[in-house]
Amino acid sequence: MTSILVSRFLLAALVLQYATIDAVNYCNLPCRGDRFHVGCGESAFAQECGESPETRDLLKEHTDEILSKINDVRDHVAKGSWGLPMAARMKVVVWDEELARLATRHTKGCLAETHACRNTERFSFPGQLNFEYTDDKLPQTKELIDAAIKKGHLQKHNISREIIESYRDNGPDGNVEELALALSDRVTAVGCGLTTWQDGAKARALLTCNFSSQTLGVDLSTKSGIVLDEKCIERMNV
């Protein structure tokens, strides 16, 4: 009986989230510097997308993989790995459909870096990471995700306490941007999108992940004790 109630609650929450997304008029959301909002207007592929652009669906196995890798690396930091002190706060990151939908809209532009606004009513300044892939042919979706995760995870060799403590609003010094955003104690949710296309003889892909905050940094203070999310503690004790 309990499992049935939990399933119904999760289904209701998901339906509510989709309804909220559909009800938002992104053209009316305020954006810094009069930037256009990625969610405003028609959802069409840009000219930069070349031939045969396609948005790939991220299945549950894909979203679970992304969340698992992000939360695993957050667990490592929470426990004081990589020579860093234990984090004072470290929430478990969850999947957010609105962030995912806006990430998908971004990938349909087929350009990694744009100045488009991606604010939502719940998240004022979402962070964003982009992974570009070019080869003779494209691998399966899971392989693309694994390649992006590996690229970010390798940045652990560049990370240090000095870099963590000297974070600035426009990002940290050093080649640690992807890993740093995933480690931010201000991040609580993520959503990703993936678009592929043909560029002459080359196959290309753009994987974009929007995070609930773009403010980088991890609270390394342990003076008041270690404060971890209960789910994070459960994961650490598994």
Swiss-Prot record:
Expressed in salivary glands. This is Tabinhibitin 5. The keyword Signal applies. It is found in: Secreted. Residues 67-211 form the SCP domain. Gene3D superfamilies: CAP. A motif (Cell attachment site) lies at residues 32-34. Keywords: Cell adhesion impairing toxin, Hemostasis impairing toxin, Platelet aggregation inhibiting toxin, Secreted, Signal, Toxin. GO terms for cellular component: extracellular region. One of its GO terms (molecular function) is toxin activity. It comes from Tabanus yao. Residues 1-23 form the signal peptide. It holds the Pfam family CAP. It comes from the Eukaryota. Belongs to the CRISP family. The keyword tRNA processing does not apply. Inhibits platelet aggregation induced by all agonists tested (ADP, arachidonic acid, the thromboxane A2 analog U46619, thrombin, and snake venom snaclecs (TMVA that activates platelet through GPIB, and stejnulxin that specifically acts through GPVI (GP6))). May act by competing with fibrinogen for binding to glycoprotein IIb/IIIa (ITGA2B/ITGB3). The lineage of its organism: Eukaryota, Metazoa, Ecdysozoa, Arthropoda, Hexapoda.
